[in-house]
Amino acid sequence: MNHPAPPAATRRPLPPAMLDALRAAFGERVSTADAVRAHHGRDESPFDPQLPDAVVFARSTDDVREVVSLCSLYSVPLIPYGAGSSLEGHLLAVRGGVSLDLSEMNRVLSINAEDLTVTVEPGITRKALNEALRDTGLFFPIDPGADASIGGMTATRASGTNAVRYGTMRENVLGLTAVLADGRVVKTGSRARKSSAGYDLTRLFVGSEGTLGVITEITLRLHPLPEAVSAAICTFPTMGDAVRTVIETIQIGVPIARVEFVDALAVRSINRHSNLTLTEAPTLFFEFHGTEAGVKEQAELVQALAGQNAGQGFEWATRPEDRTRLWSARHNAYFAMLQLKPGCRAVTTDVCVPISQLAACVEETEVDLRASSLPCPIVGHVGDGNFHVAILIDPDKPEELAEAEHINDRIVERALRLGGTCTGEHGVGLHKMRFLPKEHGDTAIDTMRAIKLALDPRNLMNPGKIFTC
């Protein structure tokens, strides 16, 4: 369908001596089985699978050091693997090599409730982490929808439905441990809430997509569970009406915890997938956190703003089971949308624009989508200016892929013109590489490349991602 790999000459077989060394060190935790390689050679991106030559399952930082050191010794590429939920081709072994599966590194290493921090291994998922925190009165709020691994969320600088209130991984990672391309271990940051000590290496690794090293520990900021939580939904005649409600809500300072947008087509898919009966119209999902009085005040204010923008059917969901059902439906929207076109794949956009430009960006995008022959539902974390179009294509029809990429190009060009970015939370991977020079300029890309080659001079760490070396 879509072929991201460099010419075949850039791939070479895994040296037999290295495979022997891996098996001697890790035994059955090394696999060259076709099924295992196939599982680790694809993600949720529209690209064709690109399989690694071997998969190693790590259980500790020492394991990671051993694998990285062998890759360095034999000049073999290495691709970190978490939960496999990437949408941009991060996990594809475009030059072969070793896929390093971190899913068994899934422990909570320490909880410091007084400091509101936790240190975890990269393979733990968001849901598992919050389950471990359940009795502390604290939670980790970053919620990308998929039950992604914390390591993958860190590597892509992810965000999600709660970003409007709690920020992204950029704000919530306090420090980390990473294994560099030569096997050395670097520790960054601290548990302190601020520091002026030297370069901010934590931020350098957050969003590096496995190209600078393998993250093996992450220290995260936690937040107290709110006293009261309430959710609501509201429908609108047009997408512009819904988006203007969000803009006004943000601009007057209402501290909403979540605000999600879904268009009519996305609502239709959610209804089918989750057995709901939501009105098939542009819809906002809200959530409010705070005291009982504060939540009530926030919700009433937002309801009034929605009414001024032709919002209708403002419905509350105060019982936990009702809120859970509502947000589960939103979190499953990606897979619900795929069911609109059985057998399809999705080309997913991820632009983010200044909140003042969100209405213009969404409304202009709507014009493009109306002219397309492809199903193109829209969802988004519109509270921070981020929205996604899932362009559904038949993987066996190249003309549909070409149309999808044309739509994607127009959306990205529009976002950049409006002062935004090509990717708000999914990362660059393979799919967004071509947009980076337009967004940042050649000098910035050259600076990024210089950092990459200073830490990984042979380009072994997840090569072929973000930019070429």
Regions found by a protein language model. Name each.
Residues M1-C469:
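Noncatalytic alpha-helical scaffold of FAD-dependent oxidoreductases
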